[in-house]
């Protein structure tokens, strides 16, 4: 059985260091948080035009465009890509366009600004209703939002008429809870649990806790293996997500290329829906391993793996961006953003990314 309450999850997690005893350096922490925001935006933007595509379709698109090595944002092709994606393609980027992967970081920030460490599932639910338009949330989030409007509140909102509750929607909301808990993965995971439990259960919850804990740990830890293990230490040891992550770590350590690792991932968890938490989390782990010292390689191989490409690219970009810091991110990925982020969150429609990082 895979639990969905925080008490049970904590009881089944492996041993781990809950406080990494980070030495506080305000300027360095700001640079890391800014790097995370920028990295998240860049990874999301790279994956946005091909969201939902399988790897084979992405490979064909690159071949048709005569791109042997992907080392920049994707080119636009009006015959294949919808016009709405033009602003997300090479040479056409003026800012980070609206994406739900970025909206939820702002939503979480607003809830935290309101209630801080006391942010509860109910606080987050009310923040959604107050700040998010209903027609621009999807799958599990749409089901949960509908439940809120019918006075079905957490935790029941996660399971009532919600067949998507192990999909990736909670995992993409994790980042802010890691940003605000430097070196404290247990607290980051707890805040992520409060958020995830309004719309997800089981591995849907674990995905968000896993990512938040990794981000908290990345403020202090150097190796991606240690960062991933910090994430694993906050979720049940024997859940399907933990198993997929451990398998992927083994393949990354024993196989010479990300393509071979992808083959193993596809054989093992490729049967899940393309928007499920588990298979996409495996791609995130792959991207972290192969991008440990190379931001570009990390987001590129993750997005080329297919499935929910804007989500996985965003998470890998966020973790690597935080680990490396804003000053160490390649200009060709960051400069086109022009420090600007569009959003559908009420009263937060157009922000400077640097201002969001300061908050």
Where do the language-model regions lie?
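An N-terminal structural lobe/cap that precedes and organizes the functional/catalytic core
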Residues: 14-42, 46-103
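Acidic, carboxylate-rich catalytic segments that either coordinate divalent cations
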Residues: 1-13, 238-274, 323-359
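Conserved structured core elements
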Residues: 31-36, 52, 56, 99-102, ...
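Extracytoplasmic mature domains of secreted/periplasmic and thylakoid-lumen proteins
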Residues: 116-168
